Amino acid sequence: MVTFEELNSQNHKIMELSKVLQAVIQDRALCDNEVTCDLFFMYVDQVKGHLDVEDRHLYAALLNHKETGVNYTAKQFLSGSAEIKRIFESYLHKWCNKRAILIKDHQSFVKETEDMFRLVLNRIQDETEQLYPLIRKVSGDSRVAA
């Protein structure tokens, strides 16, 4: 069972980490330290974990729903999840190695990291404004998401 409170808590943690990291990565000297690296991979783990929870628990009922609009929305979010994971893996392959951040070009790193943060934050906003209300409407439960 997954509650909306759990999903919102995960999203809140992701947003907090992205805000802190956004500030920290601006200073090149702070990018290579262990604390920044730990925070960065905590962010990565939180995002991956959140998407995995949604993939495993939220979409099945929506994909099997009789209303085509509900199915379509579920397919869009599932597709978006796959795309975010693909972009994430590409990003990690470029900038990380065995849970270490490898920065050759700080400006490019900052830009691509900010783009990734924006992608994830837009996803969180879409979940909050579209997906979670749809699940509440379809299930009739304002507390349990799946």
Whereabouts are the PLM-identified features?
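Small-residue-biased structural context
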Residues: 1-146
